[in-house]
């Protein structure tokens, strides 16, 4: 059994085509009923069409649905010799209607809102027609009711599937919309981020340039300050050098004056001594020498004069008490022992002094 689309618009051409065949005494065949069911797009219209075909000719042929009687077109219902009429035509119409139903099923919700009022009024008309013309048998009425229930179930199932498809389509559209919004926001964020990074880089470069300029200015300031300090130090150093040289010159001048004064005093003293030396008596001859193998005395200005006094008591060394035995190590004992050795005798020292005097006198004589 093939069911037509639930929200299919009622086309007046097929309805008039089939209703034109509804004449007095016409018995609809199964194929005729199926075609009429397929062409009709609404259950209310099917009932009206069925009643119009089964009613006397005086009734008007309005748009109705015969889809509820589609099982009557089965082979088990022998309606007469008109079953083979228009089968080829029905096959072609079925293919066209199937392709149209696929396209028109997507527009069901919009058509539902527009045709809801019309369907209700047509249902009322169908009920009135069926009540006025009870041309169906009880079994047919029961079968029509069952088919109506089945059609309602199929319509509900189709509506649910259609709603699911619409929901899926809405979800896909919403997902695409969110995706587009996310892409736009991401692009805006990337642009904002790039702009911010570019701004930060520019600020960083400007800051580095400002720091370089500040360091350069500070360096130049320090160089100028150091130059000024150096000039001040150099000026001060030159002043100190000038003062130092001036003091050295004054000292040198003073030293030269002192030397000149000393020289003059020395020359004066020498002249005085020279004048006094002419009148000074000479000392007695106290030098001795050998002449022809004999010791004789003579005067020599290079010899030392004879001492006028000498100590008749010979020199004696100072008495040193013997050292006490120390309790310390042997190194300290040896030191004390070395320190306690007696000094050389005074006679030897006197002899050495005399010999040195004699040697000095001889050296002067040789000169």
From Swiss-Prot:
Residues 339-349 have a biased composition (Low complexity). Involved in spermatogenesis. Has a probable role in anterograde intraflagellar transport which is essential for the formation of sperm flagella. It is found in: Cell projection, Cilium, Flagellum. Expressed in testis and sperm. This is Coiled-coil domain-containing protein 34. One of its GO terms (cellular component) is sperm midpiece. One of its GO terms (biological process) is spermatogenesis. The lineage of its organism: Eukaryota, Metazoa, Chordata, Craniata, Vertebrata. The modification Phosphoserine is found at residue 55. Residues 197-228 have a biased composition (Basic and acidic residues). Residues 87-108, 153-280 form a coiled coil. Residues 82-97 have a biased composition (Acidic residues). Residues 77-105, 191-228, 310-349 are annotated as: Disordered. Transmembrane segments: none annotated. Keywords: Cell projection, Cilium, Coiled coil, Flagellum, Phosphoprotein. Signal peptide: none annotated. Pfam families: CCDC34. It comes from the Eukaryota.
């Amino acid at each position: 059994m093939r069911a037509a689309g639930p929200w299919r618009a009622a086309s007046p051409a097929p309805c008039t085509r089939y209703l034109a065949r509804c004449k007095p005494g016409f018995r609809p065949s199964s194929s005729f009923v199926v075609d009429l069911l397929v062409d009709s797009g609404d259950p209310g219209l099917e009932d009206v069409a069925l009643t119009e075909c089964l009613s006397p000719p005086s009734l008007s042929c309005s748009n109705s649905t015969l889809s509820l009687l589609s099982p009557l077109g089965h082979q088990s219902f022998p309606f007469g010799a008109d079953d083979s009429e228009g089968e080829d035509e029905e096959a072609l119409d079925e293919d066209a209607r199937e392709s149209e139903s696929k396209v028109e099923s997507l527009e069901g919700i919009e058509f539902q809102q527009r045709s809801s009022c019309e369907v209700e009024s047509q249902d009322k008309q169908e009920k009135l027609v069926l009540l006025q013309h009870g041309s169906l048998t009880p079994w047919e009425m029961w079968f029509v009711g069952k088919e109506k229930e089945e059609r309602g179930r199929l319509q509900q199932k189709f509506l649910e599937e259609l709603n699911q498809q619409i929901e899926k389509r809405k979800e896909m559209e919403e997902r695409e919309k969110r995706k587009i919004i996310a892409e736009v926001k991401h692009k805006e964020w990337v642009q904002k981020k790039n702009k911010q990074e570019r701004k930060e880089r520019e600020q960083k470069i400007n800051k580095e340039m400002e720091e370089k300029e500040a360091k350069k200015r500070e360096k130049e300031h320090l160089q100028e300050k150091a130059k000024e300090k150096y000039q001040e130090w150099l000026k001060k150093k030159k002043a100190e050098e000038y003062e130092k040289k001036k003091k050295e010159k004054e000292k040198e001048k003073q030293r030269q004056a002192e030397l000149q004064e000393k020289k003059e005093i020395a020359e004066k003293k020498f002249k005085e001594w020279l004048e006094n030396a002419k009148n000074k008596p000479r000392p007695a001859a106290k030098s001795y020498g050998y002449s022809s193998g004999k010791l004789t005395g003579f005067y020599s200005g290079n010899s030392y004069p004879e001492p006028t006094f000498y100590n008749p008591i010979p020199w004696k060394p100072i008495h040193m008490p013997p050292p006490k035995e120390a309790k310390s190590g042997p190194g300290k004992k040896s030191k004390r022992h070395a320190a306690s050795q007696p000094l050389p005798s005074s006679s030897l020292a006197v002899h050495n002094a005399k010999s040195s005097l004699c040697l000095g006198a001889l050296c002067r004589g040789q000169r």
